[in-house]
Amino acid sequence: MVTKLLLIHGRVQGVAYRDSMRIRADELGVTGWVRNRRDGTVEAMVQGTHEAVDAIIAWANWGPPAAKVTKVEIEDGIGDFQSFDVAPTA
C-alpha cells in the first residue's frame, strides 16, 4: 500500500472536483479523503496500490472537465483508510 498527500492548485473549487475525485477513487479502489482548503486549493490523501495511486495522481492533474489544474504537489502521506470520503473544508 502507498499513501500520498496531494495539494492541487488552479481552478479546482466550484467545478465538482471533490465529487469527481471520489467517483474516480472508488473506480480505482483508492481510499482516503479529499477536501477544499480556504486558500482555494484542494487537498487529498490517497491510499492504494502503486498502480491505483499513480492513476489517481494522473487523474488529479486534469480533474473534471470544468477544472483547470496548474500544479499538483505530492508528498508521502499517513493514515489507514477504509473508504474515500469528501471531508469538510480546512
Where are these regions (language model features)?
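Intrinsically disordered, low-complexity, mixed-charge
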Residues: 1-90
